[in-house]
Amino acid sequence: ETEITPYGENEELLWRHRITTEVGDCGATMVALSDQKIVGFHSLGGISMNYFVPVTQELLDFLNSKTEKPLVPWRFSEDQVDVGGLYIHNDFDKFPFVKTIQKLVGFQNGHMIKYCGEGFTPVARSENRLSRQHVISGQRESFIHFVEASAKWRPIVTPMLGRLQPSALNREAYYKDVLKYDKPIRLGTVHEEAFQSAVINVIRILENAGFERGGVKACFDYGKIFNDLNLDAAMGALYAGKKKDYFVEATDEEIEEMFLRSAGKICANGHGVWSALLKAELRPAEKVAANKTRTFTSAPIDILFGAKAVVDDFNKQFYKRHLLGPWTVGINKFNKGWDLLARSLMRYEWFIDADGSQFDSSITPLLMNAVLTIRLYFMERDDITELMLRNLYTQIISTCMLAEDGLIVQKHRGNNSGQPSTVVDNTLCLMIAMEYARQRAISDGHLNMQMRYVCNGDDLLINANEEAKEVVQNKYEQYIKELELNYCFDDAFQSIEGVEFMSHKFMLRNGIYIPKLARHRIVAILEWQRSAEPQAIKSAILAACVEAFGYDDSTELIREYAISLEPVWGSFLPTDGEIEQLYLEGIAKQEVARCLAGVDDVCKFESAAPGTNEAVDEMLKAAGDDEALARANATSTSDTIPPARNVGADTTTPAKANPPSGRRPSSRSLIDNSIGGNGVQDVADRTSGIVFPVPTRKSTSLYLTPKVKLRATTEELRKYESTSLNPQQIDLRYSTQQELNDWIKASADGLGQTEEAFIDNILPGWIVHCIVNTTSSENRKAGSWRCVTNAGTADEEQVLYDIEPMYSAANPTMRAIMRHFSDLAGLVIAESFKQGRPLIPKGYIKAGVLDASSAARACDFVVRDRHDTATFVQVQNQVLVNRVSGITNWLFAQQCLALVLTRTWRAMTLRCRRGHPQPRLSASFLEVSTSCRARRRLGVQR
């Protein structure tokens, strides 16, 4: 018998009790002594209190109601949505946090707590403060003086000065924007059948663009993922500094360890604490005056690193296939990408640039669940990858974020601007919304609509006939509002040059459509200064010059301004012809590319206008073959659009046809309980497509950094071509040759031997010792090591040597020293198996390796090389995870992923008990599971 009290203000969330519990009691029923009724279920254990989930009237009503399966199944994790306001441990022993998380106390003195209600749930506390440091240091005085001193430019430029200003960084602006997440989630507004049809149509659109079911792979190569990280970004809310500050001195092993721990944390339902910061950027003056500044929520490294393993491949395929479907994510603003976009949208007479607002925060769990469903549909079949995706997207929609006053709150809706696939996910949400609106229009009798659309994040551009224009302008706002997205479709134009898409206008220049920023935005690049560094100033002026192409007067202004600076810096702008080649032919000379390096940052405005640098890099790679470029140019400028692929941008409504040859019908491929009827129409045979010509390449361009390019001659490049050396001489995993020689000399002296005697008689025994016992410095505690002489004969003898001399001079580490003997160790192990006296490395048994032929890769100083098989790599990764201290996760061999095996089994078993189907298990999972059970039977300890 115990007293029960509610925990927190919400009596329907958790209650406290004092009944003694043990591990395994979670889920046990709480029974009232008075009437023997079940009043709740034990849920959590605490230090002095235990907690149970109460039986509420809402639960009783739900159990008594007739329920139906959702048409689009719910994919979010059942275990991660609610953290119940309790203290989160958050793996502080596994990541380099500098801030701690504290439990909430009864009284909270801060700003955020007063806003916590339906939209936010307080979870915990940490240290934080509002950053008021802006990336904009002020106006560029040289440009202001130039304008003021010029009678020619002063009346033209002065009205454009100040139209964009640095965003306001203050507490009022912070809460004005962050509270956009504090909106109720409306129920019953979505037409379920139309929504199901929309999701199926988007899947078909992606399939027609080249996506294949099961064709998206998880990537657990930590090196590839690390190379894709933005190292200039911050580590996260609970860390200090940028990623590059932490990783600059990190070894490969430390980077791999962090990746494995991050992936394991996502698998184990671990929550990260995300940043919620004000965005330092240029914004329209009227928004700055209204104190409207955008916030962004970014993922911490302990979530981001592992999350990229399961989202990057889909994202890269999505970028690669831009314009094969109704999206432009990944489009190149040079090389006539926008010309192809413009001409593909010139089928009907009206253009509508839809204006969306508060898109990220308006995304509901329903929409994000649909995005998750689409990703799972195309992901390779594996329960572990599925588990990671489910947990990740549950965390994205129900994010724990650190507010400016130190309160950690959990939101319950909206996408995060700093997660690894924000733009792709937002684009998918908008595609679903457009397909949903089309289905709603069809159900309302609008059968003759003809239209195309393209999306990029929250940017939407529609090309429609007269009837479709009327429906879009009169009905689409309300249709999309049913999904809680806010769009205005009032502005319609009969020329594509009137619309604005991704903060750019379409301009016809020499018969080619090019993207153009507004003039005042180009002036803002010159007006505002991010850095006083000469190279940064040059990059800003160059960026303005590139963006101004097409505005002859603006180009003249920038060139005159650059000439005024030539006495200090000399001439640094490319010629008009070189910039024209960049836009119209996709060709840039090395001098132009060198100038463009570092331009990206100064071209970014509030609507995610595409920067320059990435596009230039892509264009340079494709520019190796002039003939191929000529063919591409001829294709994209011909009178007729290239042969169509079925992409779904066109939403005309003829009768449904059969699916393409070789592809299975997909009417039942999304869900198990699909509905019948004529609501779902086959996008594949309705649409004409947009095909981006990819030039074939006969040669590959060579990228060099700007400074190196200054001295890049044919003779200099031949030096690189002729460079051939032993990789061991430069590989940082090995000790230097001098360190190896010093170790041999010091070890020989310490054991009272000559160097020759040490190498001939003692070193072979030491190699065998390290094979069996590893190179760990923990071995020094033993005081001695054993060597066997005359092995395999009647005179076999065990000899003890002092171990301290072997380690005292081992710099930088014993493992780095012994890597010089990696090949010898492999030979010794192989020969030992042939002779029937196998040398078994300690890591071989500890990691549960089953294949005897892989024993050499369980040796901790054997180095991986290009001849290794996939099995060898798998074994070495598996041994590495077991070697790193503090990790309780296991590596699934094929995926190189650290998992807490027992917790995963428990979660899967619990799901089966709840009626879920038996999980699919990869061969790697079964192998590791079998080895674990075998160790238990044999009594082998971890």
UniProtKB/Swiss-Prot annotation:
GO MF term (any one)? cysteine-type peptidase activity
Instruction: Report the InterPro entries cross-referenced here.
Output: DNA/RNA_pol_sf, Peptidase_S1_PA, Peptidase_S1_PA_chymotrypsin, Poty_coat, Potyv_NIa-pro_dom, Rev_trsase/Diguanyl_cyclase, RNA-dir_pol_C, RNA-dir_pol_PSvirus
Q: Which Pfam families match?
A: Peptidase_C4 (PF00863), Poty_coat (PF00767), RdRP_1 (PF00680)
| Entry GO CC | viral capsid
PROSITE patterns named in the record: POTYVIRUS_NIA_PRO, RDRP_SSRNA_POS
Disordered: annotated segments: 633-678
- Give the EC number: 3.4.22.44, 2.7.7.48
Indicate the segments forming the RdRp catalytic domain, all copies: 349-472
State the Gene Ontology BP annotations. DNA-templated transcription; proteolysis; viral RNA genome replication
Its domain of life reads Viruses
- Active site, UniProt feature: 26 (for nuclear inclusion protein a activity)
| Domain Peptidase C4, chain residue ranges per copy | 1-90
- Indicate, by first and last residue, each region the UniProt record lists as having compositional bias (Low complexity): 659-669
Q: What's in the keyword line of the UniProt record?
A: Capsid protein, Hydrolase, Nucleotide-binding, Nucleotidyltransferase, Protease, RNA-directed RNA polymerase, Thiol protease, Transferase, Viral RNA replication, Virion
Positions bearing the site annotation: Cleavage: 108-109, 606-607
Q: Does the keyword tRNA processing apply?
A: no
Q: Per the record, what are the reactions this protein catalyses?
A: RNA(n) + a ribonucleoside 5'-triphosphate = RNA(n+1) + diphosphate; Hydrolyzes glutaminyl bonds, and activity is further restricted by preferences for the amino acids in P6 - P1' that vary with the species of potyvirus, e.g. Glu-Xaa-Xaa-Tyr-Xaa-Gln-|-(Ser or Gly) for the enzyme from tobacco etch virus. The natural substrate is the viral polyprotein, but other proteins and oligopeptides containing the appropriate consensus sequence are also cleaved
> What family does the entry list?
Belongs to the potyviridae genome polyprotein family.
Put simply, this protein is called Genome polyprotein
Question: Which organism is this entry from?
Answer: Brome streak virus (strain German) (BStV)
